[in-house]
Amino acid sequence: MMLRLSVKKRCMSRTIPRISGLQGSIYSSRNIFVVRSQKGKPTLRKSKGSNDGGAVNNKEKLSEWVDSDFERKMKQQEVEYERRLKELKSLTASVARIIKKKEDIEKLQEIPMPSEVNRDAEKIYGSLEVGKEKLASLPENSPSLSGIEKQPEPFNASNHSLITPAIDMPESITKRLGLAIKFLVSKTNINWTMVLQQLKEGGGFQGLPERDIRMFIYSIPKEQISHLIPVLEQLLEEGNVKKSSKIINVFIAGLSHGGYLSDESIAQIEQYCNHITKINKKGKLSRETYELMIQAYGKNNNLEKINMCLSEMKQNKLEPSQKTFSNILSTCVYKANDHKQAVEIFDSMKFLSQKTKPDTRAYQDIIVSYVNNDNIEKALDLYREMITEKIEINQRIMVALARGCTSRPELRFKAWDFIFDIYNNNWEPTLNTFEYMLYLSAKDGDVALSRAFYSKLNESNAITPRSFSFLLLAYSKSQVSQPGQSIELPPITFHEKGRNFRRNILSDVNLFPASAQNGIPFLPVLDLTSKEEIMAESSAMWAHTLMFNPSFVNTDCANTFLNIAAVMGRLNDFIDRYDSSTFLDRTGLSNDTRIIIEELPDSISSNTDISQTDGESVSSVQSKFDEMSITKSPLLKDVGSNIGLGNRKISRTSLSYVIALKAAARFKNYKFAQRIWSERGTFRKTSNFKDLSRSTKDALDFQFANAMVSCLTKMNLLDDALAILLSTEYQFKWTWKELRELYQAASDIDHSDACKSIRGIAKRAQINYEGKIRRKDFKRYVMERGY
């Protein structure tokens, strides 16, 4: 039976506040539902459009892949054992031959030789030898054995110089440099500015062969030539040397070297291309120039210009090379994040011609793209394709596959397999590999191993913002002991190599560093076993990073830092971190924003232990919390005396508000939830949100709306959650993934009207967004076709 509390006693008929973060206004009466007895509880019915069958098939495919890969490795090990056995047999045979040969030599040495023959031979050899005394008595100007006396050559200082350049340099350039050749002695520290200055004073490029000039320009490294282009152009102009297309290509390669290219650099490169078209008889660019242009546009994240270059190459009947396709593929994966375009380019490389077949780098980029788009199944298929086609596999591919396997519970064990394959192939793990080992242990909730990896990176002075973010992720994912809850062992412990690997890493952790400067504020225990320990250590790590590595702190780290408190701490802990480590950036916010203060229902009170009373300042409330808190770092408590700590806050993002709603739902605090969605409405009017693309805005709004529905559901405010669904039904694509929690809560209390409305929303979404045919349309189709 369903129990509904009276709405009159507690003023529950008040309207829900206006929600600024969504289109339109939502007004609905509030009802609090109490869960009835579990006896006879109806089960959740699956909809016809449910994807459970697809999920089961996907799990079966993953299991089949794991089994087949295990069989492949077993066969590979069997072949390896047979090879080693053959090597052992051949080694045994060769050792036997060596021993037999040695025995034969010993037998020959045992045969006695006539002493007379030995004695005569010694006399003959002694008479033929010339002693050192005889050699010393010979005159110095004695003729040679051939009877021809060699004449001494005249000394040439240029041929006997003690200074030689570390790079190949044309002889004509070397003569003009003179003593400035000393600037070219060290290959790593060449002062090219002084070299060009001395060359200019020695006559520059006047009268030098064009081939020697090109060789000299080719010898300048790409990372330095961009700063020397004005001097080189002046030398070419003074020497009446025309800038050929090959020299200009060197300039373009120098300008496009490095990471991101600005629009100014692209404009300068385009000017050089226009110059090439003018000096070229046919007015066309070469294949090399097009490849350099595509590489430059890729670093500028300009896919439109890349497509224009490809169209021009097609018009000029220039087939793109494998290098060109690889540059475009890398741009789509790492710069533009265009997975669809990346897949099309990769397929073109496979089927266009034999010359453009993808190599290891191309497979690496497309596997990373599939992993980034949560399609580890396709990434594993490509990995198997590389094995079948005998394409070389590198360490980055293994790391990407390990990272992707963490997204599937069925493949958590397989993720560490890929990591251990790096050691099996005798590869030296890179910093990127160590960081993702930390990531794997963090996703597994293995705080002890994550702390050990972070400590190892700290000892090597190799800590990066990414590794710090992964450590915070480990704190938030940690499985601490709770009454009545079991702890799952990390997947690495189910692996024989993994157990040994984990034990060796943990046994080598130094929790007491010799130097305080290089130390990190870890608790002096091997593992953290309580939420208080996790909250305290994460707060200490945050304060330590703010003081010594402030550049590591970014929006991702701040959101993870908030999530630790949302999962492990109390509501006071979360509010303290929310206010002290993040802030609302009001850039772009107009001054005419209205603030509406509505009275809260009396039935919903704050769950915080410390609440602000009338006349009490925020600072006094904060100081009171700091005095009582045992999990907040003393450095963060005394922010006033720590210069700069109080100003090192991170601007909030949409994810920050989602995490805040999760904390409000966990503690069922409606007051804090109302504050969050009110501030989220203000955040939508700031530049940080308005500058985003339309699709990104819609995705973030849907994420927050889903968090609101989940928050209200956990507070048992089912009518409010349903009101949000009804008001945004045609704005967002609601699926059973988001609706299942509310539907389950409504079915538990036999709220049939809510269940019916939720099913209707899911059904209409399948028709509007998924292209599902209506029942009446299907009947009409059958009637017209006759079957």
Swiss-Prot record:
UniProt-annotated stretches for the region Disordered: 38-58
Keywords: Mitochondrion, mRNA processing, mRNA splicing, Repeat, Transit peptide
Tree of life domain: Eukaryota
InterPro entries: Pentatricopeptide_rpt, TPR-like_helical_dom_sf
Composition bias, Basic residues: 38-48
Family statement: Belongs to the CCM1 family.
Function: Regulates mitochondrial small subunit maturation by controlling 15S rRNA 5'-end processing. Localizes to the 5' precursor of the 15S rRNA in a position that is subsequently occupied by mS47 in the mature yeast mtSSU. Uses structure and sequence-specific RNA recognition, binding to a single-stranded region of the precursor and specifically recognizing bases -6 to -1. The exchange of Ccm1 for mS47 is coupled to the irreversible removal of precursor rRNA that is accompanied by conformational changes of the mitoribosomal proteins uS5m and mS26.
Self-association and partners: Binds to mitochondrial small subunit 15S rRNA.
Protein name: Mitochondrial 15S rRNA processing factor CCM1
